[in-house]
Amino acid sequence: MISVKNERELEIMRKACKITAAARALAGEMVRPGVTTKQIDKAVYEFILSQGAKPTFLGYGGFPASTCISINEVVIHGIPGNRVLKEGDIVSVDVGATWGGFTGDCAATFACGAISPTAQKLITVTEQSFYEGIKFARQGNRISDIGHAVQTYVESHGFGVVRAFVGHGVGEKMHEEPEVPNYGSPGRGPRMVLSLIHISEPTRQF
């Protein structure tokens, strides 16, 4: 069932999302050659706790870390460890924080030093596709309108959409309905209403 939040719940979620976004920004600042993914994860863990929140990913379905850090060909759900970042890597960091019983969840991809023009284009197109999708996150539109916009933009720039993973609702649980694919025909799926919280998570491939 799709959960629509009331104003009190939205305020709590805004706080949770601000903490999550700040944790993601911290991770991005640490992406540089010579740093291990475990070091980034530890810093994010400590920051989230310092904000009175808890790392949502840690222990979720047995996941052993506070972040998902995926490098280069790894699409999502990379487990932090002793891998050392090197020049030219592209590094996706996914973070979740729970505060007041509600969850924030966000991700971004960062360049480690100088990267190839193709890798930079991948990052740029993926980020812009997120905003293209958000343009259709409006009351009365259909969920599939978002994915259609994302897919159309990405494919127009020579990339493909990863269909195995989708965005999702978020709230008291990290994964709530509805699913938000990054592809599809417009005009399908549930209609969006005010105070529906969902996460659009564009993932791309060369």
Regions found by a protein language model. Name each.
Residues 99-106, 204:
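Short, Lys/Arg- and Gly-enriched loop/turn segments at beta-strand edges
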Residues 21-87, 136-178, 190-194:
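Active-site cores enriched in adjacent His and Asp/Glu residues with nearby glycine-rich loops
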